[in-house]
Regions:
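S-adenosyl-L-methionine
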Residues: 1-4, 226-243
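Core catalytic lobe of class I
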Residues: 1-224
Length: 243
């Protein structure tokens, strides 16, 4: 689906992970554009998404803490500031601890104060809303007591997704959108991912009985998302048959 085909004030929750501007090798997108142009692009899509959500609509935005390659940039701070500037209201930030410090390959100046790199193995999930935080309607929640207690802790500990296994340069695990969806939306709510990628958000929508909408400009990634959704549906049917 094209984003212009989505009706305004119709989305309950947006969960997405946009291009990071850190030189990830996407097929149809240059992820190494000048940083000021990247921020202009960010402002444009954030404003468009603001018009799509309901007055009590929410946004869960997965972004990096910073950018070291090609010059240090405070990506999290800059994008959060832009989101507020275009009209989003800030609620909180969740720290996603990917626990992948062992995959580090660069330290800058090794064992020297000359120019060391400090790299945190975390990403950020910025939680924002349009006009009011409290939901206008009372829906059905499907979050358990244990999930609620764990997920309202602002540090989430789980691993990332294997890009080779999934076939996408920057997939996020289904666990990430699933947590956001169950914590910040009701059953049957409409969830949008404007950067669908490999389809993790729509798989999470299937798991949680939400109505999912995905937007993706790359045909190959669209086909990958459809393939994963079909495989998930087949797996679910097999589980039902076994049970």
């Amino acid at each position: 689906m094209k984003i212009d085909a989505i009706e305004g004030d119709s989305i309950d929750l947006i969960v997405t992970s946009p291009p990071y501007g850190v030189d990830i090798k996407y097929e149809n997108y240059n992820d190494n554009i000048p940083y000021d142009r990247y921020l202009d692009f960010t402002a444009e899509w954030l404003k468009k998404c603001l018009n799509l959500v309901k007055p009590d609509g929410r946004l869960c935005l997965n972004i990096p803490l910073d950018k070291l390659k090609g010059g240090g940039q405070s990506v999290y701070v800059d994008i959060t500031s832009i989101a507020k500037k275009v009209g989003w209201k800030y609620h909180t930030t969740i720290i996603w601890n990917e626990q992948n410090i062992s995959r580090r390959t660069a330290w800058g100046s090794w064992l020297s104060a000359s120019a060391p790199f400090v790299i945190a193995p975390v990403e950020m999930i910025v939680v924002m809303y349009k006009k009011q935080w409290k939901k206008k309607h009372k829906g059905t929640s499907d979050i358990s007591r244990e999930e609620f207690l764990e997920w309202t802790n602002g540090v989430w500990n789980f691993g990332g997704e294997n890009r080779t296994k999934i076939g996408h340069p920057a997939p996020f695990p289904v666990e990430l959108p699933k947590r956001c969806i169950k914590l910040f939306s009701f059953v049957e709510d409409v969830v949008l991912d404007p950067f669908l990628g490999s389809g993790s958000t729509l798989i999470a929508c299937l798991e949680t009985n939400r109505k999912g909408i995905g937007v993706e400009i790359n045909k190959n990634y669209c086909e990958l998302a459809v393939k994963r959704l079909k495989e998930y549906g087949i797996l679910q049917r097999k589980l039902v048959e076994v049970l």
